[in-house]
Design a protein with these regions (language model features):
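Ribonuclease/tRNase effector modules and their secretory precursors
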Residues: 1-169
Length: 169
């Protein structure tokens, strides 16, 4: 199999666009497993993010709701949810983007966030091209400075066009 041929399943996740319902179920399963893991480790549903230097809470019925709807749309986002523990630990800001942004109206305001932190995590795999993508981790920051994982999803990265030097003045 070639490096750029997308298989029907990646790490147990269906890759076909029309399989979002199955991916929703997998995301629920991944969150359930993550909460169980955090409880076993005595972390009370929180994971320390090295970049921000804060605990990020993975709150049941808050962290999972937005992600279930958003991440089920494509397999890479579901793959990111499967690796959420590592993403929360290692996600960092992008030097070309502000880390903290204003909340949007709707769910972000309803959840009581005063602002949002946007971090990124790059999946890199030298053997399989389709496993090279960027995930965006959105964290809601409450008035008491509690950081809550809001959403994780795959994002499209627009490549910068190379600058072509010109001989003209």
């Amino acid at each position: 199999m070639e490096n750029n041929v997308l298989p029907e399943y990646v790490s147990g996740i269906p890759t076909a666009k029309n399989r979002s319902r199955e991916r929703m179920d997998l995301i629920r399963y991944y969150y359930s497993n993550l909460w169980k893991r955090l409880q076993r480790e005595g972390k009370t549903n929180k994971i320390f993010n090295d970049y921000l230097g804060v605990d990020v809470y993975v709150a049941e019925n808050e962290s999972d709701k937005k992600t279930i709807n958003t991440a089920s749309k494509n397999w890479q986002s579901t793959y990111a949810v499967k690796h959420l523990y590592d993403i929360v630990i290692n996600a960092a800001g992008d030097e070309n983007q502000p880390v903290y942004v204003s909340v949007k109206t709707g769910t972000q305001t309803y959840n009581g966030y005063k602002n949002m932190a946007i971090l990124y995590y790059d999946f890199v795999n030298i053997e399989r091209d389709y496993l090279n993508f960027r995930a965006k981790l959105t964290i809601g920051v409450k008035a008491n400075d509690k950081h809550v994982q809001y959403c994780v999803n795959k994002i499209e990265v627009k490549e910068k066009k190379p600058t072509v030097q010109s001989n003209y003045p």
